[in-house]
Amino acid sequence: MMKKRITQLLLICLLLPLCAGAFTSCEKQDETLTLYVYNWGEYISDGSDESVDVNAEFEKYCKEVHNMTVKVNYSTFASNESMYAKVSSGSTKYDVIIPSDYMIERMIKEDLLAPLDLEKIPNYAYIDDEFKGENVYYECNSEATYSIPYFYGMIGIIYNTSIVDENDEQIGSWDLMWDEQYKGDILQFNNSRDAFGTAQYKLGLDVNNEDEEQWRLALDELLEQKKIVQGYVMDEIFNKMQSGSAAIAAYYAGDYLSMYENNEDLAFFYPQEGTNSYIDAMCIPKNAVNKELAHYYINFMCSHDIAMANALYTYYASPVTTVVEDPEYRDEMGEYAIDILYNQADDVSSQAYLNLSPEALAMQNILWEELKAKSSIGNGIYIGCGVILGILALIGVYQLIRKRRWAKLYD
């Protein structure tokens, strides 16, 4: 059985030769600097299950190497869309964010990201060439570099072998997500791009096509599926699949491996019709306050030991070549996980999401709202909630008017 742990051989002293001397200009000894990091949930080694607490190690590194007192303020998001809404609003200024490829492309085009200074990220040398230069399809052919890969992977289908018949002909296909015999046991993504993607791949459509007719075909599939779906989820999937309260779900390969460790009845496949491949990468927002410190952090995350700690904890595929080649990493992960992350993935037809035009994004959002409005489920939100909220709003207005009238009577 795979283990989600790495021994405390990852001492901070091992990182010093990798990072010392790379930065000098922002050392501040008399104040506490706060680094605001915004990442996906369950996506970093956090000290649980005998793992390394990466953010605590970064704080220690800054103190021991640069004599800086640093506090990492770490928060998480559940979808690219929710992350984008918060970052683009400017309500909170983050220093490091970790979006997916298509969202990075959008944020570059909207001038929301700062170009990176690669001289301040010497550990970039450990990133596989597959994720550099012209291979970075989401950086708009820019001469500047806006992102450093964090993890990559593909979407597949998870199913519970104690509930789903192993001889089911739908295993291996997206059709399993639409199998009526598992009504009430199927989970769908609670984000528009991935949810529509499942239907588009099932139908053999181009996920980057902007033709409304094709998107409506996908909507029809999702509307049909909603009749048998238990719920629309993101991070909630961990508890539901591990506990056996749901039987089938499309999700990310790395997260499947994490769930598998807690429930060996779970199994996984990449759909034969094709699926989504993605890269999540570290970026610095243009309005970041601590850009220099953000470079420290990104460089730290690319160091061998920290990248390996994260890869072992999250079970995602690492873009750091020294990690993938490390015998300790491969042994700790086990053949099954390595096969899913690095071997099977090479044999599967996949397509990355690209940024859609503003018009297509608006269409996608309208169709997503249409799906949710016609569904009695969706992350615990029911159609009746809209009615209830409307009634509550009317009551609130009524009470406000009533209070004002009484106030006038006593004036």
List each model region and its residues.
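Mature extracytoplasmic/periplasmic domains
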Residues: 285-348
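Conserved C-terminal helix/tail region of periplasmic/extracytoplasmic solute-binding proteins
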Residues: 344-411
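Ligand-binding "clamshell"
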Residues: 108-116, 141-144, 258-270, 331-337
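C-terminal motif of bacterial Sec signal peptides marking the signal peptidase cleavage site
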Residues: 22-25
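Periplasmic-binding protein-like
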Residues: 215-224, 262-286
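Extracytoplasmic ligand-binding site segments that recognize negatively charged/polar headgroups
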Residues: 38-52, 93-245
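Early extracytoplasmic/lumenal segment of secretory-pathway proteins
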Residues: 27-106, 110, 239
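A ligand-binding cleft/hinge motif common to bilobed small-molecule-binding domains
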Residues: 103-106, 242, 248-265
